[in-house]
C-alpha cells in the first residue's frame, strides 16, 4: 500500500480508538508495519495536522498513546456548540450507554463497548457534550483509558437525588443482567418524561 493509503488507515484507526488512544504496538500489529514505520507515519501525520492552519484536528501523544483532538484555537466554537440548547432527545445508543455508565461507574469506554457489543465513542461524546457524563481520572496501566461517571446534571435530568435512587436491579441472576439494567433505566426515564409533560 502507498503512503496516502497508510495515512487514511491511520486516521481511521485513530478515530475509532477515540479517547483511549492508539499505541505504536497496536498500530504495528493492525497495519502490519514495523515500529520505525509506525513512528514515521505518526510524525508525518502530526506535521500535516499541527502545521496546517486549515485543519481542525491535531495529533496528541498522551501516556504512550496517540489520539486525535480538536485545536485549542477552535475552543470558542466548540463551547458555543455545546451551549446551544438542543431539543433533540437522546438516541437509543446514547440511553443504553448512559444506563451502563450510571450503574457501573466509574467505567472505561472499552468496558461500555464490551457490554453493548459495539463502539460507543459517539454516544459518549454526546453524553459528555450534554453534560450528563464526564471523565474522572484514568485507569492505571497500559493505555491509561479515561474513567467515565455521571454528573449532577444527570441526576437533575432524571429526577434523582443521588445514585442510590437509581432503580434497583430486581434479579442479578437474570439471563441478561445488562439488559435488565437498561430496561429499568428506560422505565425510569420514561416516567420522568411523562411527569414533565403533565
Curated annotation (Swiss-Prot):
GO biological processes: cell division; chromosome separation; DNA replication
GO cellular component, one term: cytoplasm
Main location: cytoplasm
Compartment(s) of residence: Cytoplasm
Gene3D superfamilies referenced in this protein's UniProt entry, alphabetically: Winged helix-like DNA-binding domain superfamily/Winged helix DNA-binding domain
Biased composition annotated in UniProt, kind: Acidic residues: 172-181
Keyword annotations from UniProtKB, A to Z: Cell cycle, Cell division, Chromosome partition, Cytoplasm
One Pfam family, short name: SMC_ScpB
Keyword rRNA processing: no
Entry-linked SUPFAM superfamilies: Winged helix' DNA-binding domain (SSF46785)
Source domain of life: Bacteria
InterPro entries per the UniProt record, alphabetical: ScpB_csome_segregation, WH-like_DNA-bd_sf, WH_DNA-bd_sf
Subunit-level organization: Homodimer. Homodimerization may be required to stabilize the binding of ScpA to the Smc head domains. Component of a cohesin-like complex composed of ScpA, ScpB and the Smc homodimer, in which ScpA and ScpB bind to the head domain of Smc. The presence of the three proteins is required for the association of the complex with DNA.
PANTHER family in UniProt: SEGREGATION AND CONDENSATION PROTEIN B
Family the entry assigns: Belongs to the ScpB family.
NCBIfam families: SMC-Scp complex subunit ScpB
The protein's name in its UniProt record: Segregation and condensation protein B
Organism: Listeria welshimeri serovar 6b (strain ATCC 35897 / DSM 20650 / CCUG 15529 / CIP 8149 / NCTC 11857 / SLCC 5334 / V8)
Amino acid at each position: 500500500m502507498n503512503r496516502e493509503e497508510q495515512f487514511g488507515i491511520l486516521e481511521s484507526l485513530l478515530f475509532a480508538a477515540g479517547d483511549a488512544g492508539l499505541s505504536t504496538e497496536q498500530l504495528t500489529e493492525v497495519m502490519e508495519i514495523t515500529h520505525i514505520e509506525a513512528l514515521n507515519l505518526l510524525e508525518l501525520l502530526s506535521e500535516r495536522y499541527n502545521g496546517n492552519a486549515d485543519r481542525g484536528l491535531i495529533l496528541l501523544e498522551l501516556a504512550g498513546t496517540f489520539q486525535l483532538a480538536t485545536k485549542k484555537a477552535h475552543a470558542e466554537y466548540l463551547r458555543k456548540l455545546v451551549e446551544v440548547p438542543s431539543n433533540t432527545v437522546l438516541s437509543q445508543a446514547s440511553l443504553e450507554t448512559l444506563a451502563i455508565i450510571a450503574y457501573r461507574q466509574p467505567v472505561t469506554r472499552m468496558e461500555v463497548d464490551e457490554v453493548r457489543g459495539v463502539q460507543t465513542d459517539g454516544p459518549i461524546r454526546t453524553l459528555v457534550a450534554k453534560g450528563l457524563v464526564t471523565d474522572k481520572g484514568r485507569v492505571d496501566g497500559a493505555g491509561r483509558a479515561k474513567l467515565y461517571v455521571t454528573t449532577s446534571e444527570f441526576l437533575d435530568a432524571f429526577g434523582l437525588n443521588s445514585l442510590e435512587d437509581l432503580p434497583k436491579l430486581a434479579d442479578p441472576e437474570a439471563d441478561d443482567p445488562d439488559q435488565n439494567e437498561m430496561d429499568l433505566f428506560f422505565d425510569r426515564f420514561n416516567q420522568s418524561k411523562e411527569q414533565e409533560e403533565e
